[in-house]
UniProtKB/Swiss-Prot annotation:
Listed GO biological process terms: translation
Gene designation: rplK
Source taxon at top rank: Bacteria
Organism lineage string: Bacteria, Bacillati, Bacillota, Clostridia, Peptostreptococcales
Quaternary state and interactors: Part of the ribosomal stalk of the 50S ribosomal subunit. Interacts with L10 and the large rRNA to form the base of the stalk. L10 forms an elongated spine to which L12 dimers bind in a sequential fashion forming a multimeric L10(L12)X complex.
Name the UniProt record assigns to this protein: Large ribosomal subunit protein uL11
SMART domains linked to this entry: RL11 (SM00649)
Keywords: Methylation, Ribonucleoprotein, Ribosomal protein, RNA-binding, rRNA-binding
Protein purpose: Forms part of the ribosomal stalk which helps the ribosome interact with GTP-bound translation factors.
Post-translational modification (record): One or more lysine residues are methylated.
Alphabetized GO MF terms: large ribosomal subunit rRNA binding; structural constituent of ribosome
Transmembrane domains' residue ranges: none
Family: Belongs to the universal ribosomal protein uL11 family.
Gene Ontology CC terms, in alphabetical order: cytosolic large ribosomal subunit
PANTHER family registered for this protein in UniProt: 60S RIBOSOMAL PROTEIN L12 (PTHR11661), LARGE RIBOSOMAL SUBUNIT PROTEIN UL11M (PTHR11661:SF1)
Length: 141
């Protein structure tokens, strides 16, 4: 028989840097999960993606065991990494901070495809372009 899920926790943690400190500790502690065990597993699984923020969905079962699924980094994080900026524009409609090529948008869309609710690569590219525009990044053809 399948284990009964008693809770789902969604967090965004820096790859390879999960620690029992907030936000990880309190979120897992209230469900009775082994915090150090999770941190070690997560850090081992994401060590190769250092510097990126990794969304993770943790399923907690009735016997206090858990499983987790890592997702691809948020589009905004990938865009910032691709063009080498620290943050997006505070006023994206007035002040543009950088430019990004369609090729880089395509690369990001291909990477994000498993997590996006898009039927085609073109639809995924459109979503990533929208994220870039909302950050004050100009999308070039």
């Amino acid at each position: 028989m399948a284990k009964k899920i008693v809770g789902q926790i969604k967090l965004q943690i820096n790859a390879g840097k999960a620690t029992p400190a907030p936000p990880v500790g309190p979120a897992l502690g209230q469900h009775g999960v082994n915090i150090m065990g999770f941190c070690k597993e997560f850090n081992a699984k994401t060590a190769d993606q250092a510097g990126l923020i990794i969304p993770v969905v943790i399923s907690v079962y009735q016997d206090r065991s858990y499983s987790f699924i890592t997702k691809t980094p948020p589009a905004a994080v990938l865009i910032k990494k691709a063009i080498g900026i620290q943050s997006g524009s505070g006023e994206p409609n007035k002040k543009k901070v950088a430019k990004i090529s369609k090729d880089k948008i395509r690369e990001i869309a291909e990477l994000k495809m498993p997590d996006l609710n898009a039927a085609s690569l073109e639809a995924a590219m459109s979503m990533i372009s929208g994220t870039a525009r909302s950050m004050g990044v100009v999308v070039e053809d």
